[in-house]
């Protein structure tokens, strides 16, 4: 067997194992989703697939913590490394990414607030809302706009299917500009799905802080560079 053939065999086995793992996880989530009841006042947050406490999910979470109309809400943050994120408010729980507790949170929460694609098998029920914040302006081609060969783990067709499947479950998607809106519609196949109207061209919540600053904060930032 040549080196190229060996590499192809290893890649095939990895893909097979990944599909098996995802099938097991998918079956578990389906059972949880069928068993759990939706809690309208529970919100789950995830940023960059659990890698950080950041971006628009963080901005929305911190706004909701201060807003009196959400005083009786409870929250769940999904992290890959829970220990590195310190303490949160009493009304907030931390769960590990890709864990049973994380899937249970998604199965129960009335609202999901995320800035990157979720696992394919995590799908909301009719009484759940999935708010996709995304994480920037797609200046490079992503999703269904990709034309060149795929990456090391996915073909072009697989990437397009993944983005289309993601779009099918999104309730609302945030955009920061008309340019961004058109790119997101195209990348997520929203026009073909008849879902262009899910785009909310409000600007990214993470940018609100740039317009709501104080002189004291400006000076503090300047001092940090000295």
Spans of features found by a protein language model:
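Receiver (REC) domain switch-region micro-motif
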Residues: 43, 112, 173
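A nucleotide-sugar donor-handling region in carbohydrate enzymes
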Residues: 12-26, 140-143, 148-149, 154-226
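Hydrophobic/aromatic residues located in beta-strands of well-ordered beta-sheets
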Residues: 75-76, 130, 173, 199
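Extended catalytic core of nucleotide-activated donor transferases of GT-like folds
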Residues: 58-62, 67, 91-155, 161
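Structured loop/turn residues at beta-strand edges in well-structured enzyme cores
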Residues: 38, 107, 125, 168, ...
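Glycine-rich nucleotide phosphate-binding loop and flanking beta-alpha elements
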Residues: 51, 113, 119-120, 180-182
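Helix N-cap/beta->alpha junction signal
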Residues: 79-81, 116, 176-179
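N-terminal pre-catalytic "stem/leader" segment of glycosyltransferase-like enzymes
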Residues: 2-101
């Amino acid at each position: 067997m040549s080196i190229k053939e060996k590499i192809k065999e290893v890649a095939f086995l990895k893909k097979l194992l990944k599909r098996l793992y995802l099938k097991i996880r998918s079956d578990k989530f389906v059972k949880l989703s069928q068993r759990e009841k939706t809690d309208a006042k529970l919100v789950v947050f995830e940023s960059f697939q659990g890698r950080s406490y950041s971006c628009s999910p963080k901005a929305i979470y911190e706004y909701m913590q201060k807003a009196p109309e959400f005083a009786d809400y409870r929250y769940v943050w999904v992290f890959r490394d829970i220990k590195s994120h310190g303490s949160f408010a009493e009304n907030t729980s931390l769960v590990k990414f890709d864990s049973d507790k994380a899937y249970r949170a998604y199965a129960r929460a009335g609202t999901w607030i995320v800035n990157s694609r979720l696992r394919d098998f995590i799908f909301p029920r009719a009484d759940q809302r999935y708010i996709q914040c995304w994480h920037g302006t797609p200046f490079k081609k992503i999703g269904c706009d990709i034309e060149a060969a795929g990456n090391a783990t996915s073909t072009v067709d697989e990437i397009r299917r993944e983005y289309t499947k993601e779009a099918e479950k999104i309730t609302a998607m945030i955009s920061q500009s008309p340019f961004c809106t058109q790119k997101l519609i195209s990348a997520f196949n929203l026009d073909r799905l008849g879902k262009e109207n899910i785009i909310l061209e409000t600007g990214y919540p993470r940018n609100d802080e740039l317009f709501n600053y104080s002189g004291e904060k400006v000076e503090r930032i300047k001092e940090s560079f000295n």
